[in-house]
From Swiss-Prot:
One GO-annotated biological process of the protein: proteolysis
Swiss-Prot/TrEMBL cofactor(s): Zn(2+)
The protein, known as: Vacuolar membrane protease
Organism listed in the record: Penicillium rubens (strain ATCC 28089 / DSM 1075 / NRRL 1951 / Wisconsin 54-1255) (Penicillium chrysogenum)
Enzyme Commission number(s) of this protein: 3.4.-.-
Matches recorded under InterPro entries: Fxna-like_M28_dom, M28_fam, Peptidase_M28, PFF1_C, PFF1_TM
Length: 987
């Protein structure tokens, strides 16, 4: 007769367990990988109100050249944008067509802002910026019909509107296709869409094309000075921190505004990324921090996030993105904006605030994440907190009550090694404690080894994740699964136990309960929702554990089992005693007739230790043989285990693995893409490898209750995978043409002595190898030191470089991009690149007046050798805005000056402190020293910056060059001010 386990194809047996668990993991991981790396296709026919072909052509026009704020190409992009906006406005359908759609034709206003300026202080840096933003306002059907902005100081009337923001400047080394060209053309299409009959907004829509985001978020800051900045209450910021792929929801301000994003056809993102920004794990910032943090709007930050290696390089172009990526951001923006402008409730309106922020009301902190890139879950953090607290209490109580019921039913075999038998007047072994101490080794050994691998890779080949992150994942996963299987098989061979599964689930329950406590505390104290997946992880683990406890009700009572076992042993025991008695009689008879060979000792006084051991072993062996008479018992497991259900393991797998994989795999992929290529920026590489090792344990821990049933085929295969990937990860070169290493370029020209020094900054030893492989640097003494770019410590290697051609000879002060070739004839260094003067506007004052001008630029600086500036003002600037004043108590050491016109002369009044807080006894306190620096960023002609051209031409194919600072060229002249010449300071 066939046994129960033989008849059941889903039984807890090696082949079903191996095949089904492997199939389930692959069936979920593979689609998630495909979704992560493949963008949903754009429709063949553009939806009503949109034109994808036109949008793609606009992107190509926008990205013809590098167009940073301080470039002539930027002016051309601005002119082109105004033309495109005007063309869209002129093509607006007639009033009759709107009537057919039962709508009123909306009013459209275009603001070409060449007036707004802003002076702000951020710690030790002061900035004066003149904006060149473009705003398009589409009046909503429920907006006030008056042009309230035409009256100075007048506040908007009625409900707040919606702002969509993108910046049209790029960095000086990137074409800006995704940073932020796609965002810009999306904004153009939004203007077109909401001017199409059937889509007229109910709330007013402001579309902002800001200029200057790449430098201190200047464009968004100066937008605050425009009257329309008081109108919008919600916003959608479109950005690019990668160079293609999907656009992810980086962060959001609250639940209510995030619900608008949930209307997107292909939502993508997790609240974990928002927590990364909040805790400073992601250092780069977007206009979101200005719009939400300073102006008080409530909104969303949507951006491209990979591949990071193309970000701010010449591969951020139309060639390396796609119309599918464009459609992903455009469709998201349309759905989100349409939901926001259609909202007529008061949830985005509040009372006027004293701090100058807009009265946008207050929202609730949110939890949000996508599911397979097609659905989006969003709910309040308070809801997650309430559910977490409830589950933390209910789950252990449920297991406790179940355990009590099992004990009263006399079926609590757990934690019992034996039970007393009145029949035999002895303890009968249950072996119910077997397998209890297995889990700590089962989890710690594989995880400890993968953590060790993380440290080893960081030591030997730290940047391999830059181009081969999946090789790292393969190494970690294969090592973890093989070791988990090996440890479980060794343990199960030595002490087979039917309780391996229930004990493993119990340990996992305790572990996830502890993690849940930590996450719940952070939810309440810090407002962090990134641990939402732990809630679902714990919930699944609890249910799986409870199922294992409920299985115990299928067991016979312990007394019944012991009684049956005792009865089965009674005859054999009596027979043994009779046999033993007969042996004794025979021995006695033999002793009565001693012979010459008889021992001198009497037989009954012989040592009996050997006999005792043999009898004990025979009894234990006999117990096991009697227990194993049940054909449903697996191998050498406990005899009572034959009645346990054989299919519940699959239910446990279905409850835990799918949910865990659906939530954690996207997080793993998202974070891997975001972090794997940040090491080139100076981020600690160990972080990504530790992240992968820990995520591996979380992803595959649901296998542990079943892994001792695996056949050897898959683990042995994974062992070979581990060996191969480990060797590859240790010896392979970490960079490739498609995953280049970014080096940061800067050329500094001392206009006082004509010294021109170029430098490349990046990670050692690659930066020095590249630098001194250049023709102009060959033969020069290596000059490398350490510097900081932001908070990241990097190596900088310098060499004497040919002069740039950024300023024309003769009397010409500026050139357009069409005439930029004339700069190539400028071969002589002229101190007239920068002109400045220093005077005292008031005799008895600590103020000094600087007049600064640079040729063919609109960006200069006043750099101090110490933090000696207490205040400054630019003549002709607007009144200071207290929202943007955040000075350091030590004072300022730099003033950044930006002008919307070329060759501008800034007049700056600077107040100095009596004593420089950074000065030491070795510094001459009788004078104030510094440098006037101007910057040049125009890089659209070969030959303008020979050193940069040389880097691009002669660097290896796996190297990309990007800007180190605001400008590619910094020309400077020194100045000195005698403190005795300052009236107040000299008195």
């Amino acid at each position: 007769m066939a046994t129960r386990k033989a008849r059941n194809p889903l039984a807890f047996m090696p082949w079903p367990v191996t095949i089904l668990t492997t199939a389930m993991y692959l069936a979920l991981i593979i689609p998630l990988l495909v979704i992560h790396h493949n963008v949903p296709p754009a429709p063949r026919t553009s939806p009503n109100g949109l034109n994808l072909t036109e949008a793609w052509q606009d992107l190509q026009s926008l990205t013809k050249g590098f167009h940073p704020y301080n470039s002539h190409q930027n002016d051309e992009v601005r002119s082109w944008l105004l033309e495109r906006i005007d063309a869209i406005k002129q093509s607006t359908p007639s009033t009759e067509e709107y009537r057919d759609a039962k709508e009123e034709k909306p009013d459209v206003f275009v603001f070409d802002d060449l007036v707004s300026n802003l002076t702000f202080i951020d710690k030790s840096v002061g900035v004066y910026f003149e904006g060149t933003n473009i705003l398009v306002y589409i009046r909503g059907s429920e907006d006030n019909k008056q042009n309230w902005w035409e009256t100075p100081g007048r506040a908007p009337v009625g409900k707040g509107g919606v702002l969509v923001n993108a910046h049209y400047d790029s960095v000086s080394t990137g074409y800006g296709a995704t940073d932020d060209g796609v965002g810009v053309v999306t904004c153009l299409q939004l203007v077109k869409y909401f001017l199409t009959p059937g889509h007229a907004p109910r709330r007013g829509l402001v579309v902002l094309f800001n200029n200057g985001e790449e430098d201190y978020l200047n464009g968004a800051r100066v937008y605050s000075q425009h009257p329309m900045a008081r109108f919008a209450h919600t916003f959608l910021n479109l950005e690019g921190a990668g160079a293609g792929g999907r656009a992810t929801l980086f962060r959001s301000s609250d639940t209510e505004v995030t619900q608008a994003y949930a209307k997107s056809e292909h939502p993508f993102g997790s609240v974990l990324s928002a927590n990364g920004f909040e805790k400073g794990l992601i250092s780069s910032q977007t206009d979101y921090v200005v719009l939400e943090g300073i102006l008080g709007l409530r909104g969303l930050d949507v951006a491209f996030f990979e591949p990071r290696a193309r970000y701010h390089t010449d591969q951020d172009d139309a060639r390396h993105t796609s119309i599918d990526s464009l459609w992903h951001m455009l469709s998201t923006a349309v759905a989100t904006t349409e939901e926001l402008v259609s909202d007529t409730t008061d949830r985005f309106d509040g009372h006027i605030r004293d701090d100058g922020t807009v009265p946008s009301g207050s929202g609730t902190r949110a939890v949000w994440f996508d599911l397979f890139g097609s659905a989006f879950a969003v709910f309040r953090l308070h809801t997650l907190f309430a559910l977490s607290v409830t589950l933390l209490i209910v789950a252990p109580l449920t297991l406790l009550v179940t355990s009590v019921i099992l004990s009263r039913a006399d079926k609590m075999y757990l934690f019992r090694s034996s039970v007393y038998s009145e029949i035999n007047d002895d303890y009968i072994p249950l072996r119910g404690l077997r397998g209890f101490f297995r889990f700590p080794f089962l989890i710690s050994i594989p995880t400890g080894v993968t953590v060790g691998l993380a440290y080893m890779v960081t030591k030997v080949n730290p940047f391999i994740a830059h181009s081969s992150s999946y090789a790292v994942w393969s190494m970690m996963i294969s090592a973890w699964i093989f070791l988990a299987w090996f440890v479980s098989r060794v343990a199960n061979s030595a002490r087979p136990s039917a309780f391996h599964r229930v004990y493993t689930w119990t340990w996992m329950f305790v572990l996830t309960w502890s993690l849940m406590v930590v996450c719940t505390v952070y939810e309440h104290e810090e407002g962090l929702a990134g641990g939402y997946f732990i809630f679902f992880y714990f919930a699944g683990t609890f249910l799986a554990t409870w199922i294992s406890y409920l299985e115990l009700f299928a067991l016979p009572t312990k007394s019944e089992y012991v009684g049956r076992l005792a009865e089965s042993r009674r005859p054999s025991t009596q027979g043994s005693r009779l046999a033993a008695s007969g042996d004794e009689h025979q021995d006695d008879a033999a002793e009565e007739d001693p012979t010459e060979s008889t021992s001198l000792l009497h037989g009954r006084h012989r040592p009996t230790f050997a006999n005792y051991v043999r009898v004990g072993v025979d009894r234990a062996s006999q117990d096991e043989e009697e227990e194993e008479e049940d054909p449903n018992v697996y191998e050498h497991e406990q005899g009572w285990s034959g009645v346990l259900p054989r299919w519940t393991w699959l239910l446990q797998l279905l409850i835990t693995a799918p949910v865990i994989l659906m939530l954690i795999v996207p997080l793993a992929l998202l974070t891997t893409s975001a972090l794997s290529q940040t090491g080139q920026d100076g981020s600690p590489q160990l972080l990504i490898y530790l992240f992968i090792s820990c995520l591996t344990a979380l992803l595959f821990a649901p296998m542990l209750p079943f892994i001792h049933r695996y056949t050897y085929h898959l683990p042995i295969f994974l062992l070979f995978v581990f060996i191969g990937t480990m060797i590859y990860n240790l010896v392979a070169f970490p960079f490739a043409d498609s995953n280049r290493l970014k080096l940061f370029f800067l050329q500094e020209v001392d206009l006082d002595n004509g010294i021109s020094t170029a430098s490349l900054t990046g990670m050692p030893p690659f930066v020095s190898d590249v630098t001194y492989g250049l023709p102009s640097a060959a033969g020069q003494n290596e000059s490398c030191d350490w510097t900081f770019r932001g908070k990241r410590k990097l190596q900088r290697c310098s060499w004497s470089a040919p002069l740039p051609h950024v300023v024309p000879d003769g009397d010409s002060l500026s050139v357009s991009s069409e005439d930029a070739d004339s700069l190539l004839d400028a071969t002589e260094l002229s101190p007239d690149w920068i002109s400045f003067s220093i005077s005292h506007p008031q005799r008895d004052s600590s103020s000094v007046r600087f007049e600064v001008s640079g040729q063919n630029t609109r960006n200069c600086r006043i750099n101090m050798d110490g933090n000696s500036i207490t205040n400054f003002s630019v003549i002709g600037s607007s009144a200071p805005d207290h929202r943007f004043l955040n000075p350091s108590p030590d004072g300022l050491n730099r003033i950044q000056l930006w002008s919307r016109t070329w060759d501008n002369k800034w007049t700056v009044d600077v107040d100095f402190s009596k004593h420089d807080s950074s000065e030491t006894d070795e510094v001459d306190e009788s004078s104030i020293t510094g440098r006037i620096t101007c910057l040049w960023s125009d890089n659209n002609r070969v030959g303008l910056i020979p050193a940069l051209d040389e880097v691009r031409q002669f660097s290896p194919a796996w190297v990309a060059v990007t800007k180190f600072s605001d400008g590619l060229i910094e020309g400077s002249r020194a100045f000195e001010i005698k403190r005795s010449s300052l009236g107040a300071l000299g008195s």
